[in-house]
Amino acid sequence: MDSLMNTTPGGGGKPVRMSSREIAELTGKRHPDVKRDIEKMLSDLSEDASIFAHIYLDSMNREQSEYLLDRDHTENLLMGYSPILRRAVLARMREMEALLAEPRV
């Protein structure tokens, strides 16, 4: 799962971003369904989805799309999910933030 998170350990100045793939993994939802939920949320907020879009290479070296969300957008997305799913994702977000806060050696 560490390969899915987008952080800079040691306080590199970048905010923690959670990928739509990691949200899907943590919630047990299909990645296409999470992407659909994100696109709907961003549309409802009148925000440009392309700002959050990211291309990655899958295991077969094919380009695939995902979204990288900051904490506010991640929490907003989770409002539509069950409390159990919200807890899992927010716990992971706290782990990522703790990694970011660790001093770099």
Model-derived segments and spans:
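An anion-engaging/catalytic patch
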Residues: M1-V105
